[in-house]
Structure formats: C-alpha cells, structure tokens
Amino acid sequence: MRRLSKRQILLLHDQLLSQSGGSPGLRDDGLLESALNAPFQSFGDTDAYPSLPQKAARLCYGLVKNHPFVDGNKRIGAHAMLVFLTINGTELVYT
C-alpha cells in the first residue's frame, strides 16, 4: 500500500491554497506527522484500520481534526483522502 509522504502533503496543500486561497503555513509539524501515521497504526499483529477505505477515512479525519495547517485543513483532509485512494488503485467516479 502506498502512503502519502509529508512532502507530498505539503505540496498538495500549497496547490490547494494557490487555487482556492487562504493563509499558507504549517502550524504544527508533530500534528501533521500524527495525522499521516495514524492510518497505519497496529496493535500486535492487528491493524487498527485494516482496509483501504478505513485508512483513507482516518487520514482525512486526522488532517481535519489535528488542524496542522494555518488554513485549509478540511480541504487538505478531503483532497489527501481522494489522492490516497487513487494512488492505491481505487477508481473514483464522480456523478
């Protein structure tokens, strides 16, 4: 399973802000790291979020809830979730 790196998230965030406006800046690096790692938590041999959709949802939730950026946290959460699903082979159909 492919993960989004911190660098990729920062680039996606910059792209979103350039397209939709907002204040740039990372508010808390630790909260960003936490949001990126949370979907891949495990306890013993058991994944906390075993399926791709669960991991994607947890990534979105972490970025929104942790609020690591100055602005655009909900936007990056939703966008990162969709990019994560796409790079892991999920075909997204918008109707």
Predicted regions and their residues:
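FIC/Doc superfamily catalytic core
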Residues: 1-95
